[in-house]
From Swiss-Prot:
Protein name per Swiss-Prot or TrEMBL: Probable cytosol aminopeptidase
InterPro entries: Leucine_aapep/pepB (IPR011356), Macro_dom-like (IPR043472), Peptidase_M17_C (IPR000819), Peptidase_M17_leu_NH2_pept (IPR023042), Peptidase_M17_N (IPR008283)
Residues at which Mn(2+) 2 binds: K268, D273, D291, E352
The keyword Disulfide bond is assigned to this record: no
Provenance organism: Baumannia cicadellinicola subsp. Homalodisca coagulata
Active site (catalytic residues): K280, R354
């Protein structure tokens, strides 16, 4: 879909459809009031007959409104004017895009950016509208013989009433389009079936990205290299699979100083997780193809970074692996020596993601990172704690935690901080090794974060548990692309602060 911004007088706008807001009690927004004046009261007469009350998300499509140059006018209910917040605005945009897709309009002129949303500016309103519109038009039908009929809507133009906001509005378009494309890339990768998307497939996507841009280099560590390095925890997880474990490294150099310390993003890439010997229940095991959503997120973010040419040095790691049941599988009771030299007693082979990540987090020390963020569908406990709306976050550095929280608020892609206190570390005590790979049943998301923190003492680090936010299980099944938007916003913020 194409998006544009412009500033012009309403009466001169020619479009297949004009979109304007109406508040509760049939109170016009500024643009709706202008439309009513141009139509000589035609719209207000319709509303007085009860056609639209103005409740949030209500829509009324009008055809051939007198003296209006556009064929259609779409009025959208915006609720009470003083209570218009982020949540309601998103609902308004969702209902608007859905209605436009049903009108048969190829393009539309949207005036909803004039709405005053609590605490939000025009940049935010446009960017959110772009991301939402892209998301609503997303389909994954790669493996369907009969494809869905594509939406007719091809272009949305946002009309800006204040010309001084044109520059920031164009920036919002640029960011929104890039992030939406990154979200789509992450969703496409995560939605791939596990018989196709294995570690080698992730590696091919890394090389594909490198071949597309001179600022990107890709390299892959295979089983033999990891064995020589001593990445025994990582390798143990994949030793029951016929698919080789591969760690793909995507290096982007955008900083003017090539020696500037990089930001490293680590994505858990379990392309399928059976649970291993501690096998998962068969119900919904098919969803365990989504256990690589962390790697898909990193891939999507790297696509955004490339699109925006961010002036940063960034390394993305796709920690590819598959946890399967076999006579060669690792077992409960095994003791593994990690790359860091610390030993881990395996109590549960379904707590495998942290074993892959712990060696990866040690490996990336060689890059002398400024910041490390790992993204992982790590624990069901995080879903119990935070549901499907918030990503769990733990960090060993409060300023980093605050930066991520701020980026999440800006992007509307929310996270919630969890503690990393010593009391939880005691849950990992082992009688025969330095630690166990699981704690007790209580606070499982936190003990998993505590486990990872033991491998991150040499840099500032944050852990994002996306088990509850990475994919939908019921309505609109499939990957969500979260938290691509939040991480992209974090990197945009960083690029601004680092280059002042």
């Amino acid at each position: 879909m194409d998006f544009r911004v412009k500033s012009g007088r309403l009466e001169k706008q020619r479009s297949a459809c004009i979109v304007a807001g109406v508040f509760e009690s049939r109170q016009f927004s500024f643009i709706a009031e202008q439309l009513d004046k141009i139509s000589k009261g035609y719209i207000s007469a319709l509303l007085r007959s009860g056609e639209l009350e103005g409740q949030v998300g209500q829509v009324l499509l009008l055809y051939h409104v007198p003296y209006i140059m556009s064929k259609r006018v779409l009025l959208i209910g915006c609720g009470k004017k003083r209570e218009l917040d982020e949540r309601k605005y998103k609902k308004i945009i969702i209902n608007t895009v859905n209605a436009l897709n049903n009108t048969g309009s190829i393009e539309a002129m949207c005036f909803l950016t004039e709405l005053q949303v609590q605490g939000k500016n025009t940049y935010w309103k446009i960017r959110q509208a772009v991301e939402i519109a892209h998301n609503l038009c997303y389909t994954f039908d790669k493996f369907k013989k009969t494809k869905k009929i594509s939406y007719q809507l091809r272009r949305i133009t946002f009309n800006i009433t204040n010309r001084r906001e044109l520059t920031s509005s164009k920036c919002a378009l640029q960011h929104g389009i890039a992030i939406a494309a990154g979200i789509k890339a992450a969703k496409d990768l995560a939605n791939m079936p596990p018989n196709i998307c294995n570690s080698a497939y992730l590696a091919s996507k890394a090389h594909e990205l490198a071949n597309s841009n001179k600022h990107i280099n890709a390299s892959v560590l295979g089983k033999q290299q990891m064995k020589e390095l001593g990445m025994n925890a990582y390798l143990a997880v994949g030793q029951g699979s016929a698919n080789e474990s591969l760690m793909s490294i995507i290096e982007y150099q955008g900083h003017l100083d090539s020696k500037a310390r990089p930001i490293v993003l680590v994505g858990k890439g379990l392309t399928f997780d059976s649970g291993g010997i501690s096998i998962k229940p068969s119900n919904k095991m098919n969803e365990m193809k989504y256990d690589m959503c962390g790697a898909a997120t990193v891939y999507g973010v790297m696509r955004v970074v490339l699109s925006l040419n961010l002036p940063l040095n960034i390394i993305g790691v796709l920690a590819g692996c598959e946890n399967m049941v076999d006579s060669c599988s690792f077992r409960p009771g095994d003791v593994l020596t990690t790359l860091s030299g610390q030993t881990v007693e395996v109590l549960n082979t379904d707590a495998e993601g942290r074993l892959v990540l712990c060696d990866t987090l040690t490996y990336i020390e060689r890059f002398n990172p400024e910041i490390v963020i790992d993204i992982a569908t790590l624990t069901g406990a995080c879903v119990i704690a935070l549901g499907h709306h918030f990503t769990g976050m733990m960090s060993n550095h409060n300023p980093l935690s605050n930066e991520l929280s701020s980026a999440a608020e800006q992007a509307g892609d929310y996270i919630w901080p969890l503690p990393l206190s010593n009391e939880f570390h005691e849950e990992l005590d082992s009688h025969c090794a330095d630690m166990t790979n699981v704690g007790g049943s209580a606070g499982g998301a936190i003990t998993a974060g505590c486990f990872l923190s033991r491998f991150t003492s040499k840099y500032h680090w944050a852990h994002l548990d996306i088990a509850g936010t990475a994919w939908n299980t019921e309505k609109h099944q499939g990957a969500t692309g979260r938290p691509v938007a939040m991480l992209s916003q974090f990197l945009i913020n960083r690029s601004i602060s680092d280059n002042k």
